[in-house]
């Protein structure tokens, strides 16, 4: 079973990300996660994407156990020549405090994790930078669970007039998610603190 169902990022989504990355690259000073920010109390987000680059070791472990990972549209996935796999989740909307970047960012799309006829889907991710967690809606239920713990220790943040960039967000599996996945797939592969990867947020700001 193939681990990933790969498809290139769509042109519109890729164009948005490239534009925001280019703007971030032109800036030489980054605000830390808990400092600097700007002269606005809050910034409203109305688009962009969050990219999740998956840890290579975790991918290998999942592949060896027979798992398949597929994006739920409009999320997309791409693989670099190096083998690095990145999922892109479009941003629906959100808001961040300019002073410390606390707030929430809501996304569209999600992920399906499958093995031996069993599929668990999670979608509509919400990043809560204040709580340091990413929550997800479980497909087929009304439940929303804490899916990933977010480590902002190495965060680099940039806020501009029309965009915001949060780079280097570490993502690990929560205890609740690990328990649910182990129960669904009758395995002990998933553990609290399992390294999932690194997230980079490229957000466009509302006018």
Where are these regions (language model features)?
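Secretory targeting and sorting signals
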Residues: 1-33
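Intrinsic-disorder/low-complexity peptide segments enriched for small residues
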Residues: 1-4, 11, 21, 145, ...
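Poly-acidic low-complexity segments
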Residues: 2, 54-55, 128, 154
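Extended hydrophobic/Leu-rich segments
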Residues: 3, 120, 155-160, 205
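N-terminal segment immediately downstream of the Sec signal-peptide cleavage site
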Residues: 32-100, 155, 164-207
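Predominantly extracellular/secreted and cell-surface proteins with exposed
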Residues: 72-146
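Acidic, glycine-rich flexible loop segments
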Residues: 124, 130-175
């Amino acid at each position: 079973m193939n681990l990933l169902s790969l498809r290139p990022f769509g042109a519109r989504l890729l164009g948005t990300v490239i534009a925001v990355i280019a703007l971030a690259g032109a800036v030489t000073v980054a605000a830390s996660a808990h400092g600097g920010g700007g002269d606005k109390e809050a910034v409203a987000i109305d688009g962009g994407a969050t990219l999740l680059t998956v840890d290579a070791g975790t991918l290998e472990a999942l592949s060896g156990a027979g798992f398949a990972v597929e994006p739920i549209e409009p999320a997309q996935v791409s693989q670099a020549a190096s083998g690095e796999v990145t999922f892109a989740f479009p941003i629906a909307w959100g808001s961040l405090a300019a002073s410390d970047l606390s707030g929430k960012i809501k996304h569209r799309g999600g992920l399906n994790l499958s093995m031996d006829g069993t599929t668990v889907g999670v979608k509509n991710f919400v990043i809560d930078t204040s709580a340091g967690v990413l929550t997800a809606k479980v497909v087929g239920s009304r439940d929303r669970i804490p899916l990933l713990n977010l480590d902002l220790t190495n965060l680099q943040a940039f806020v501009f007039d029309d965009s915001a960039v949060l780079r280097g967000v570490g993502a690990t599996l929560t205890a609740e998610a690990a328990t649910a996945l182990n129960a669904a797939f009758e395995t002990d592969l998933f553990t609290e603190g399992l390294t999932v990867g690194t997230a980079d947020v490229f957000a466009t700001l509302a006018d």
